[in-house]
């Protein structure tokens, strides 16, 4: 009986997903503001996070056509910006492991996302089309 119980417990632990921290629009805006992100960017960032990851820090995208994946709340691509767990080639412009985007703290993801923004602009995110004209208000968040 003990062996059966341990087997069932092990099976449950193996299939239970790690959910990470899931932010709300306002909790993300406040946290990013605390990390120094300009207030005039916060509505755009919350829109991108909503469409990229549903505000989930543990989000890992499905494989892209070039074999890369996107990681974390802002779905940062491992071919250009972070070192993938597989050890595959990456330009790793943010000088960070992709796994560092999958933690509860968004600070590493925010720093890298700000670099992506500086180098490529908002259009670096394919979901920007949902955030280009109508942005969610963050006025009620502060």
Swiss-Prot record:
<dbReference type="InterPro" id="IPR001916">
    <property type="entry name" value="Glyco_hydro_22"/>
</dbReference>
<dbReference type="Pfam" id="PF00062">
    <property type="entry name" value="Lys"/>
</dbReference>
<feature type="domain" description="C-type lysozyme">
    <location>
        <begin position="21"/>
        <end position="142"/>
    </location>
</feature>
<keyword id="KW-0325">Glycoprotein</keyword>
<feature type="glycosylation site" description="N-linked (GlcNAc...) asparagine">
    <location>
        <position position="66"/>
    </location>
</feature>
<dbReference type="InterPro" id="IPR023346">
    <property type="entry name" value="Lysozyme-like_dom_sf"/>
</dbReference>
<keyword id="KW-0964">Secreted</keyword>
<feature type="active site">
    <location>
        <position position="70"/>
    </location>
</feature>
<feature type="active site">
    <location>
        <position position="52"/>
    </location>
</feature>
<comment type="function">
    <text>Lysozymes have primarily a bacteriolytic function. Shows antibacterial activity against Gram-positive bacterium M.luteus but shows no activity against Gram-negative bacterium E.coli. Likely to play a role in the eradication of ingested pathogens during their passage through the intestine.</text>
</comment>
<dbReference type="InterPro" id="IPR000974">
    <property type="entry name" value="Glyco_hydro_22_lys"/>
</dbReference>
<dbReference type="GO" id="GO:0042742">
    <property type="term" value="P:defense response to bacterium"/>
</dbReference>
<protein>
    <recommendedName>
        <fullName>Lysozyme 2</fullName>
        <ecNumber>3.2.1.17</ecNumber>
    </recommendedName>
</protein>
<feature type="disulfide bond">
    <location>
        <begin position="26"/>
        <end position="141"/>
    </location>
</feature>
<dbReference type="GO" id="GO:0031640">
    <property type="term" value="P:killing of cells of another organism"/>
</dbReference>
<keyword id="KW-0326">Glycosidase</keyword>
<feature type="disulfide bond">
    <location>
        <begin position="47"/>
        <end position="131"/>
    </location>
</feature>
<comment type="similarity">
    <text>Belongs to the glycosyl hydrolase 22 family.</text>
</comment>
<feature type="signal peptide">
    <location>
        <begin position="1"/>
        <end position="20"/>
    </location>
</feature>
<dbReference type="GO" id="GO:0003796">
    <property type="term" value="F:lysozyme activity"/>
</dbReference>
<dbReference type="GO" id="GO:0005576">
    <property type="term" value="C:extracellular region"/>
</dbReference>
<keyword id="KW-0378">Hydrolase</keyword>
<keyword id="KW-1015">Disulfide bond</keyword>
<keyword id="KW-0929">Antimicrobial</keyword>
<keyword id="KW-0081">Bacteriolytic enzyme</keyword>
<feature type="disulfide bond">
    <location>
        <begin position="82"/>
        <end position="98"/>
    </location>
</feature>
<keyword id="KW-0732">Signal</keyword>
<feature type="disulfide bond">
    <location>
        <begin position="94"/>
        <end position="112"/>
    </location>
</feature>
């Amino acid at each position: 009986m003990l062996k059966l119980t341990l087997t069932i417990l092990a099976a449950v632990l193996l299939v239970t997903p790690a959910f990470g921290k899931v932010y709300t629009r306002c909790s993300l805006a406040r946290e990013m503001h605390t990390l120094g992100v300009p207030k005039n960017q916060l509505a755009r960032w919350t829109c991108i996070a909503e469409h990229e990851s549903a505000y989930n820090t543990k989000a890992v995208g499905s494989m892209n056509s070039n074999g890369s994946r996107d990681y974390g709340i802002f779905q940062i691509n491992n071919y250009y910006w972070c070192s993938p767990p597989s050890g595959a080639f990456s330009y790793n412009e943010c000088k960070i492991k992709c796994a560092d985007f999958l933690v509860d703290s968004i600070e590493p993801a925010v720093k890298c996302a700000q670099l992506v923004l500086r180098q490529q602009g908002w259009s670096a995110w394919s979901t920007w089309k949902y955030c280009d004209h109508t942005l969610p208000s963050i006025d009620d968040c502060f």
